[in-house]
Amino acid sequence: MAKDIKFSEEARRSMLRGVDTLANAVKVTLGPKGRNVVLEKKFGSPLITNDGVTIAKEIELEDAFENMGAKLVAEVASKTNDVAGDGTTTATVLAQAMIREGLKNVTAGANPMGLRKGIEKAVVAAVEELKTISKPIEGKSSIAQVAAISAADEEVGQLIAEAMERVGNDGVITLEESKGFTTELDVVEGMQFDRGYASPYMITDSDKMEAVLDNPYILITDKKISNIQEILPVLEQVVQQGKPLLIIAEDVEGEALATLVVNKLRGTFNVVAVKAPGFGDRRKAMLEDIAILTGGEVITEELGRDLKSATVESLGRAGKVVVTKENTTVVEGVGSTEQIEARIGQIRAQLEETTSEFDREKLQERLAKLAGGVAVIKVGAATETELKERKLRIEDALNSTRAAVEEGIVAGGGTSLMNVYTKVASIVAEGDEATGINIVLRALEEPVRQIAINAGLEGSVVVERLKGEKVGVGFNAATGEWVNMLETGIVDPAKVTRSALQNAASVAAMFLTTEAVVADKPEPNAPAMPDMGGMGMGGMGGMM
């Protein structure tokens, strides 16, 4: 396919048009008075959102060179979202400002490599200063503030803070769509996995259709149980203890299942059988997790154990087990704290090494189940369109909160970027490097300016006043007042601000050092199909 090539100024100008188109669509959403953007969907109702990365991913421009510029800035939003989970609009605004300022200087004759060095120096200094001024997040109220600012909804802030308090900072918090209008929190304490009872005859509560076992023994194996003789020795020991039994096995079938059900119905003993969760290596790991949590052993041939040799000592114990048609929940396992901590450490190490997003998610789930539980935020709304928009906002708030727990918080509303202004301005440099530093200084003002513009105010006036204020004092665009941002609870996670700045600078530096752009030439329209008027179907009647 033939290629279209543009050089130097012409190439950069074409790409800049794409950058501006995308950034202008995204930046209207910034701040407490930011607006929404409506995205057309091929199927279903349009999506209304103020999430920067969602908007950026949807934008596709007709001109190939403009589209490349737009895609570069979309990459800033996407990367920031991957690292910090929020701050994508801020990252886009910063990138646009750096690219625009940088191009002015390149056009005026500045050396792009010198500018790049200056930009990199300035960002390193800004990130160091952000670390210095960030404060660790303390208590439920701080978490609620971070989440409420991100979602622009205090109720969501409270929900997320409560969820994190209940399941711990490492706990898994998932989002589900609710059938109702309200958004509510549902916390599953203990370890839950998605396998239900092998037979409905095993239930103990016919109203709720669930089996509840108090202080049960737990037999954990990766084998199929089809012959009752295999588990008879251990069954007899459990019956003598007068306790119920939960069997977790690859499968319980045939004669073994029939015998267990008959004895359960006769009242000889209380037993529930469930299939082991997961598949393959993940199943082995999850069975091991359950064993450590309940203080039992996995009875597996890999360790030279068979079911006939199992004793009460090799079984796990728990305070309570609830088994429904679809889920099994083990609460208050009696495993030793040291072993559980060691297992958590092991999973954390695997989390750091894995590159697969799917594996990361599964490891995070296992970690949460061992560390305390799973919280589910059920998102409700009046219409499907509102539901999708609300879900995106809560997802951002959740990511923001996790980022705040990791690296602390800084003053929100773009104030923290202005607070590092003096530090960046004090860097000693000459020539094009100094110009590169000035490009970053100009970009640091941009988020505050845009927040003010979206609130219907003159951005430059707010920026100039902010330069003279003490660290931490900023402009609350929601009320139009000047306040101490940290004390008022208008905060951003340091990680989000840092990621936005670093990613914007990275793409801007690459953009400015571009000298040629290559794109596919658009193909001429394909000729239309020839007229088929002479091919009437009348003569084919005899084929019917």
UniProtKB/Swiss-Prot annotation:
Pfam families to which the protein is assigned, alphabetical: Cpn60_TCP1
CDD domains: GroEL (cd03344)
Coiled coil segments of this chain: none
Domain of life: Bacteria
Annotated SUPFAM superfamilies: GroEL apical domain-like (SSF52029), GroEL equatorial domain-like (SSF48592), GroEL-intermediate domain like (SSF54849)
Keyword presence, DNA-binding: no
GO CC annotation: cytoplasm
GO MF assignments: ATP binding; ATP-dependent protein folding chaperone; isomerase activity; unfolded protein binding
EC number: 5.6.1.7
Known catalytic reactions: ATP + H2O + a folded polypeptide = ADP + phosphate + an unfolded polypeptide
Location relative to the cell: Cytoplasm
Oligomer status and interactors: Forms a cylinder of 14 subunits composed of two heptameric rings stacked back-to-back. Interacts with the co-chaperonin GroES.
Family: Belongs to the chaperonin (HSP60) family.
Matches recorded under PANTHER family: 60 KDA HEAT SHOCK PROTEIN, MITOCHONDRIAL (PTHR45633)
Job of this protein: Together with its co-chaperonin GroES, plays an essential role in assisting protein folding. The GroEL-GroES system forms a nano-cage that allows encapsulation of the non-native substrate proteins and provides a physical environment optimized to promote and accelerate protein folding.
Name listed for the protein in its UniProt record: Chaperonin GroEL
Origin species: Bacillus thuringiensis (strain Al Hakam)
Gene name per UniProt: groEL
